[in-house]
């Protein structure tokens, strides 16, 4: 069940398996997302730094630079705060922890249902937008939603 959206949201989809990338991209576009694609880690880092996205869906196993390194470099070197969902077949606890340690906001294990990906995207985007509406100066917190 898709949530109605008032405006399009942009997503960078980083997946080296073309068939899966096309399936996920088509689904997201049908639910009012604007999707950019990257099939490798270097392209993902370039797009993640030069463009502004509402979220990034990032596969861990990529040619060249892996997804964990991409995530860590976007967070540490480029200070990118865009929500990142790791997308991978790795389902061991250690793998998940490495994803979160690299800076991921969520972790989705393949195979997955498209509505679950959409729900997770909606959630990380909603949380990131909520955080942008809160400001703190000298211990005084201001929430623009309550004004």
Q: What is each model feature region?
A:
Residues 1-128:
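N-terminal/domain-start alpha-helical segments
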Residues 9-10, 122-147:
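Short, Lys/Arg-enriched segments at the junction into DNA-binding effector domains
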């Amino acid at each position: 069940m898709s949530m109605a959206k008032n405006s399009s949201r942009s997503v960078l989809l980083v997946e080296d398996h073309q068939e899966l990338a096309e399936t996920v991209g088509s689904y997201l576009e049908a639910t009012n997302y604007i999707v950019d694609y990257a099939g490798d880690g270097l392209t993902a880092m370039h797009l993640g730094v030069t463009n502004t996205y509402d979220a990034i869906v990032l596969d861990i196993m990529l040619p060249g630079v892996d997804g964990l390194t991409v995530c860590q470099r976007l967070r540490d070197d480029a200070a990118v705060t865009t929500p990142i969902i790791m997308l991978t077949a790795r389902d061991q606890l250690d793998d998940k922890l490495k994803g979160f340690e690299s800076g991921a906001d969520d972790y989705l294990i393949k195979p997955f249902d498209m509505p679950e990906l959409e729900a997770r995207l909606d959630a990380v985007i909603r949380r990131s937008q909520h955080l942008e509406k809160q400001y703190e100066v000298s211990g005084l917190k201001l929430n623009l939603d309550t004004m």
